[in-house]
Design a protein with these regions (language model features):
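Substrate-binding cleft of secreted/luminal carbohydrate-active enzymes
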Residues: 281-303
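Asparagine-centered strand-capping/turn motif at beta-strand->loop junctions
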Residues: 395-400
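Substrate-binding/active-site clefts of carbohydrate-active enzymes
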Residues: 2-160, 181-189, 203-205
C-alpha cells in the first residue's frame, strides 16, 4: 500500500498519514489473513517543484534522502521518524510484519542525504537516465564506497524493526553486491527477508543462490501467463510450462495479479471485471505454497484506471472502507459488488493461509492426463491435486465465461505418487465429475 493514498480521505488532493493506519485498520487487514504489509513511499523522495519530478507528489523511487521519511506522511514534521517507528510497532502488534522499499540502482537527481551523502564517485558517468527514469541518477557500483553506503542504509532501516525489504530492479545491480550485503544484514537481523523485483528467469538462480534473496517476483511467469489466459490469449495448459521452468524455485516466487507497475484487474487491458479474474486468483493462491501479494484496493475491485503513484490522490472505495472502519463496520459503505468480492478474497485467503493441504502440501499437475479428454477443455480449464499427510484435494479452475461440467482423469501415476489405494469410487479408470462456475474454481476433497 501507499500510505499517502490508502489513508487519504479527500477526493481531490490531500494525503494519507502514518496515523491513518490505525490499530483498527490493521485488525481488518489481519482478518484478510495478511502476514506482511509492504508500505511504499516511506523513504523521502523528491516532490513537486524539485528537479524532474513526476506528478504532484513525485515518484517513491526517486529517493532524495535515504535516512529520512516523507514529511507529508507525518502529523508533525519534527516527529516524522517516531511516527513511522510507531507504525512499525502497531503493525507488529497486529501480528504482521513491515516491508519497505530499498532502491539500489538509482536515486533522485537532487539527492542530498542527511547522512553519508553521495559524491561523484557514487554516480555512474552521465548520471541521469533518459526516458521514463529521467527523475533519477544511476549509482556506480564499480566504487566500493557505494557498496558500503548502500549496506549501511539497509542496516539503518533494519534497525527500525522492519521485517524485510522489497528491493527494486535488482537485476540492474551486480549480484556480487547482494552476495556481499545480504548476509551482513541477516547476521545482525536474523529472519529479515529480502524480496527482489526480477524479470529475467535466467537470472533467478544467481539471485537466489548467489545473491541470497528469499523471494523473487513471479511477473514473467505466472502473472504474465495467467493474464494472457484470462484474456483468452493463451491456453490454460501453459501454466504447466511455467511451474516446470521454475522447478524448486516455486515456493520462493512471489505471486500477484496486481501491483503498482501493472494494470488494475478491471482494466480493459486485463480482465475488464474483477470477477473475471477469480480463476486466476484461484490458481495463484492454491497451486503451490508460494506467497501471494494483494495490491491495496484489489480486494474491492478498484479500477479500471491504473492507480497513480506519482500524485496526491485517493481511491473512492478505500475512502468508504476507511470510513466504515472508523464506525466499527468496515463493510458499511461498500457497494454490493465490492462486499461480494471482498468476501471471496477473504474466503480464498482463509483457505490459502489456514488449510494445511494448501499452505503445506505438495502439488500434482493433472493437465497432461486430460489432453485427450473429450469432457474437459485443457485450454480453458486447469486441474491439479494438492496432498498433505494423507489428505488429497482435487482443484479445478475454469477460465470460461460460463459454468462448465467436466470430468477429470486422475492417472495411475498420481495414485502411486501419493500412495493412494484405488477403490470403487476413486481409481484411474473412473473420471471424477466436477461442476465449476464461470471464471471460478472448485476444490473437492477426494481422499
Amino acid at each position: 500500500m501507499l500510505p499517502r493514498i490508502f489513508g487519504n480521505a479527500k477526493a481531490n488532493g490531500g494525503t494519507g498519514k502514518f496515523k491513518d493506519i490505525t490499530p483498527e485498520v490493521l485488525e481488518e487487514l489481519k482478518e484478510l489473513n495478511i502476514t506482511h504489509i509492504w508500505y511504499t513511499g516511506i523513504i523521502k523522495h523528491s516532490t513537486a517543484g524539485e528537479r524532474g519530478v513526476k506528478g504532484t507528489a513525485g515518484s517513491p523511487y526517486a529517493i532524495n534522502d535515504y535516512y529520512d521519511v516523507n514529511h507529508y506522511l507525518a502529523s508533525r514534521k519534527s516527529s516524522r521518524m517516531k511516527e513511522f517507528e510507531a507504525l512499525v510497532e502497531r503493525t507488529a502488534q497486529a501480528g504482521m510484519g513491515t516491508i519497505i522499499d530499498f532502491v539500489p540502482n538509482h536515486v533522485a537527481c537532487d539527492y542530498v542525504g542527511t547522512q553519508a551523502p553521495f559524491t561523484d564517485e557514487n554516480y555512474y558517468p552521465g548520471k541521469t537516465f533518459d526516458g521514463d527514469w529521467s527523475d533519477t541518477a544511476k549509482l556506480n557500483y564499480t566504487s566500493h564506497d557505494t557498496w558500503v553506503k548502500m549496506r549501511d542504509i539497509l542496516l539503518f532501516w533494519a534497525s527500525k524493526g522492519i521485517a524485510g525489504f522489497r528491493c527494486d530492479m535488482i537485476e540492474l545491480v551486480t549480484v556480487d553486491f547482494w552476495k556481499w550485503a545480504i548476509p551482513q544484514i541477516k547476521e545482525q537481523y536474523p529472519g529479515i527477508i529480502f524480496i527482489g523485483e526480477a524479470y529475467q528467469p535466467e537470472n533467478y538462480w544467481n539471485y537466489f543462490n548467489i545473491g541470497g534473496f528469499d523471494y523473487l517476483y513471479d511477473k514473467s511467469g505466472f502473472y504474465d501467463t495467467l493474464r494472457r489466459i484470462v484474456r483468452g490469449e493463451d491456453s490454460a495448459s501453459s501454466i504447466t510450462r511455467q511451474w516446470q521452468q521454475l522447478g524448486d524455485f516455486q515456493p520462493k516466487m512471489l505471486n500477484f495479479l496486481e501491483n503498482h507497475d501493472e494494470d488494475r484487474i478491471p482494466s480493459e487491458y486485463f480482465a475488464s471485471s474483477p470477477f473475471k479474474a477469480l480463476s486466476a486468483l484461484f490458481v495463484s493462491l492454491f497451486y503451490n505454497t508460494a506467497p501471494f501479494m494483494i495490491y491495496a484496493g484489489q480486494e474491492f475491485g478498484v479500477g479500471p484506471e491504473k492507480t497513480s503513484i506519482f500524485d496526491f490522490c485517493s481511491l473512492e472505495p478505500l475512502r468508504r472502507w476507511n470510513k466504515g472502519v472508523k464506525e466499527s463496520d468496515s463493510q458499511k459503505y461498500l457497494h454490493y459488488e465490492e462486499s461480494d468480492l471482498y468476501a471471496i478474497y477473504k474466503a480464498f485467503c482463509d483457505i490459502a493461509v489456514n488449510d494445511p493441504v494448501i499452505c503445506k502440501g505438495d502439488t500434482f499437475d493433472l493437465q497432461y492426463a486430460n489432453f485427450e479428454n473429450g469432457n474437459y477443455n485443457h485450454h480453458r480449464q486447469f486441474s491439479f491435486l494438492r496432498h498433505y499427510e494423507g489428505t488429497v484435494y482435487l482443484c479445478v479452475a475454469n477460465f470460461e465465461d460460463h459454468r462448465v461440467d467436466v470430468e477429470i482423469n486422475i492417472p495411475q501415476h498420481a495414485f502411486d505418487y501419493y500412495g493412494i489405494q484405488p477403490d470403487e469410487t476413486l481409481n484411474p479408470n473412473e473420471r471424477i465429475k466436477v461442476s465449476i462456475e464461470k471464471n471460478a474454481g472448485t476444490i473437492l476433497r477426494i481422499k
